[in-house]
Swiss-Prot record:
InterPro entries named in the record: IGPD_sf (IPR038494), ImidazoleglycerolP_deHydtase (IPR000807), ImidazoleglycerP_deHydtase_CS (IPR020565), Ribosomal_Su5_D2-typ_SF (IPR020568)
Catalytic class of the enzyme: lyase
Family membership: Belongs to the imidazoleglycerol-phosphate dehydratase family.
Protein name: Imidazoleglycerol-phosphate dehydratase
Pathway(s) this gene product operates in, as recorded in its UniProt entry: Amino-acid biosynthesis; L-histidine biosynthesis; L-histidine from 5-phospho-alpha-D-ribose 1-diphosphate: step 6/9
Reactions it catalyzes: D-erythro-1-(imidazol-4-yl)glycerol 3-phosphate = 3-(imidazol-4-yl)-2-oxopropyl phosphate + H2O
Superkingdom as given in the UniProt entry: Bacteria
Length: 195
């Protein structure tokens, strides 16, 4: 069973995350940040990861702690659920169009966290959501999930479309990387023998 439950409580946020990597993309995400919930829903649906996220954050200050800390907890849950990575494909990529936006994501569930982010968002806000928080989320997810993650905007003029294409492309890349390879069901996908 590739599942995990993570709770994380600080002076800034109180978070619970439950995921099932072998799900169907069922989600119930409530962080108090509407646009972010919409993006988490996309991540769940397109990665086929069942996901429940609850966050009570210091939104009276701003959305930063909520978004970053959910990324931390979700990354921790991903790392726990995938375990020793035995039998997974490991690599995934996706080139995803959404209207004017075209975003490419490529990732390696390597245990070596690294983010390369080349996604310019033309506006500072999407509604009330600070667009710089999109990168903050993926930095936290990559760091705590042990992902090498490259995300690149190839086209786009609408910030909402670009951000959503980023979440969807990462989701599709995750979906591919998390698949189990029936030919290597008990093998670690590395010549080193561990990841």
């Amino acid at each position: 069973m590739r599942r995990a439950t993570i709770t994380r409580k600080t002076a800034e946020t109180d978070i619970s995350v439950e995921i099932d990597l072998d799900g169907t993309g069922v989600y119930d995400n409530r962080t108090g940040v509407g646009f972010f919930d919409h993006m988490l829903d996309q991540l769940s649906r397109h990665a086929l990861i069942d996901m429940t996220v609850r966050c009570d954050g210091d939104l009276h200050i701003d959305d930063h702690h909520t978004v970053e800390d959910v990324g931390i907890a979700l990354g921790q849950a991903l790392a726990e659920a995938v375990g020793d990575k035995r039998g997974i494909v490991r690599y995934g990529s996706c080139l995803l169009p959404m209207d004017d936006a075209l975003v490419r994501a490529a990732l390696d569930i390597s245990g070596r966290p690294y983010l390369v982010w080349d996604v310019a968002l033309p506006t500072a806000k999407i509604g009330t959501f600070d667009t710089e928080l999109v990168r903050e989320f993926f930095q936290a997810l990559a760091t705590h999930g042990g992902l090498t993650l490259h995300v690149t905007r190839l086209a786009g003029i609408n910030s909402h479309h670009i951000a959503e294409a980023a979440f969807k492309s990462v989701a599709r890349a995750l979906r591919a990387a998390l698949e189990t390879d029936p030919r290597k069901a008990n093998a670690i996908p590395s010549t080193k023998g561990s990841l």
